[in-house]
Amino acid sequence: MLPKATVKRIMKQHTDFNISAEAVDELCNMLEEIIKITTEVAEQNARKEGRKTIKARDIKQCDDERLKRKIMELSERTDKMPILIKEMLNVITSEL
């Protein structure tokens, strides 16, 4: 579980809008999914090199396109998602 207060603080650094508890919960869920996917890909990278330790380079080597597709799937999973979260996900994918 990601600390909701930290996620909300980060969100507030990027907007003057009010942020509902539901929006924070939804973004926390999405970020946890992104962490899960990234970890799985990093594990595969480490395994290919015969290691049992995930290193920073394994994270850096994660397939940007795979992550981008998953983030877009998450952002499209509901029409009820607050626009702010959709915009934040768009920013994340544009940085990949």
From Swiss-Prot:
<dbReference type="GO" id="GO:0005694">
    <property type="term" value="C:chromosome"/>
</dbReference>
<keyword id="KW-0238">DNA-binding</keyword>
<dbReference type="GO" id="GO:0003677">
    <property type="term" value="F:DNA binding"/>
</dbReference>
<protein>
    <recommendedName>
        <fullName>DNA-binding protein HmvA</fullName>
    </recommendedName>
</protein>
<feature type="site" description="Interaction with DNA">
    <location>
        <position position="12"/>
    </location>
</feature>
<comment type="subunit">
    <text>Homodimer. Dimers then assemble into higher oligomers, with the DNA wrapped around the protein core.</text>
</comment>
<dbReference type="GO" id="GO:0005737">
    <property type="term" value="C:cytoplasm"/>
</dbReference>
<keyword id="KW-0158">Chromosome</keyword>
<comment type="function">
    <text>Binds and compact DNA (95 to 150 base pairs) to form nucleosome-like structures that contain positive DNA supercoils. Increases the resistance of DNA to thermal denaturation (in vitro).</text>
</comment>
<feature type="region of interest" description="Interaction with DNA">
    <location>
        <begin position="52"/>
        <end position="55"/>
    </location>
</feature>
<dbReference type="InterPro" id="IPR003958">
    <property type="entry name" value="CBFA_NFYB_domain"/>
</dbReference>
<dbReference type="InterPro" id="IPR009072">
    <property type="entry name" value="Histone-fold"/>
</dbReference>
<dbReference type="Pfam" id="PF00808">
    <property type="entry name" value="CBFD_NFYB_HMF"/>
</dbReference>
<keyword id="KW-0963">Cytoplasm</keyword>
<dbReference type="GO" id="GO:0046982">
    <property type="term" value="F:protein heterodimerization activity"/>
</dbReference>
<dbReference type="InterPro" id="IPR050004">
    <property type="entry name" value="HmfB-like"/>
</dbReference>
<comment type="similarity">
    <text>Belongs to the archaeal histone HMF family.</text>
</comment>
